[in-house]
Amino acid sequence: MSARVERLAWRDIHLDPIDLPTAKLQLTLGLGSGLSRRPGDAPGRVYAVTDRGPNLFISQAIDDYGLTHLETLRGIRDAKIMPLPEIGPEIVELQVEGSSVSFVRRIPLHATSGARLHGAAPDGDDMEPLFDLSGQPLQPDPMGADTEAIAVMPDGSFFLAEEYGPSLLRADANGAVVGRWVVPGAERVMQQAGMEVRGVLPELAGQRRMNRGLEALCASPDGCWLYLGLQSGPSGADPGTTPIWKLDTASGELAGQWAYPFDAPASFLRDAARRKVGPGDPKVCEFAWAGEDRLVVLERIAHTTKLYLTDLSRLPEKRLLMSSDDHTDIGPDMEGMTILSPTEILLVSDNDFGVGRAETEFWRVSLDEPLLG
């Protein structure tokens, strides 16, 4: 199967800049963590999701923005500064028409009380240390979420995968989070008024590596089944595979599980040309439904993105649809993906809210034969 690619026009949505000692932190809405389409919607209507919000490495905050009072944090492993944790995760409705993508509306995620979800982490001993601009630790809060994938359901509601818990959020069409699925034993930590918290996720999901939680998600068109996967294999497990689970959307009951095999790290050519890559580097970032137990899988490191058509019953076989090593105009950090038509796939990059001045990229991948049916 051969592929043609086209970058679609898009103008990032600018947020208010933050004045810092030596430079302004310019921010844009980072809506590229996940994409989804609802069967029956108008052609080109898609839904995107942001993650937890902008964050800075400690060295970046000190060296690039003059936040020298953070010097005492420099030696804390994996520490991050979150300048605006209150931005929080949200859904963004978009329209693809011709060769452009346009903004329709933002749907903030919130509790049934109206309180916004935000970017701080829930309680747990396996969370990265997070600090505000003053250098104070962000307090754990069950209202925190780091959403990384989205599946829109036939009734207009949403499932969202987030990697802090990890957990699955169930939100209504207006963004009110009415339920949260977690691994057994995590119910107390995630409990919130007005939100049903159920310990139904596979226990293995709770063994995720830091920042490598639930990253890929899609639903069957009838809304009966969810497919979800960890970005990388669980901590201590074989780094050459990562689990894929199939869940009943009504009960959360496990209906299937598979081990998805990663390509050899050296085969991600654009990444291997920049640095030494190893077994823990490849990751799965998105699923798109292509038939019963058939998925398009977005597999990448950073600069090389590969799309595979995968019949789960025939793993480890997988069929390459496109590699960005053959289309070097495609930028890094492709995270979101959905199927626009039987022969068209839409990709979007995560621009990290414009930190580092990255732009969001939308790409249409056109195939010479249909994926569906």
Spans of features found by a protein language model:
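Sequence/structural signature of beta-propeller domains
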Residues: 1-373
